[in-house]
């Protein structure tokens, strides 16, 4: 089997940057790496990206609203394709898979939108559990500063409140799932990368 690492965190935490740096680190060590993300680039993923842009309200597609439950099911459908067509085959062939977000994002965000946590967990039971989940923890105030230049289509105060709930949920999930390790995302990019590499060496490579 291969190695499966997930990078999680609220918006602006630096997930994509750290996922790319970790992929390069593994490649330098001679591993074959698959760098992926959720939502994916499949039809499901593209549909979800349209939903995500609407923020904390119910998703809107072509003017029609869908419920948070329907949104959660779309995320799960996209994830099922992701797991069965990319993640499982890559791991079975001995590759390293690094994912920018995974089902923990669904738990944190959709729980913050009022859905039942246990229902969300049950909905994602098919998902392969990673060897390590790096939670890049960042205060919401800093998150908002970092993403201020991005295109935001919802009211600022609603985004702040949602991100606060999501951050709280991530920290609660870290107490529930032993594979989650917290890294301070306020540090420099280099220091964060060093912390992540340390976790990979300690939690995964030391046992190989």
From Swiss-Prot:
InterPro entries: P-loop_NTPase, Thymidylate_kin-like_dom, Thymidylate_kin_CS, Thymidylate_kinase. Belongs to the thymidylate kinase family. Pfam families: Thymidylate_kin. Signal peptide: none annotated. GO terms for biological process: dTDP biosynthetic process; dTTP biosynthetic process; dUDP biosynthetic process. It comes from the Archaea. One of its GO terms (molecular function) is ATP binding. This is Probable thymidylate kinase. ATP binds at residues 9-16. It catalyses: dTMP + ATP = dTDP + ADP. GO terms for cellular component: cytoplasm. Its EC number is 2.7.4.9. Keywords: ATP-binding, Kinase, Nucleotide biosynthesis, Nucleotide-binding, Transferase.
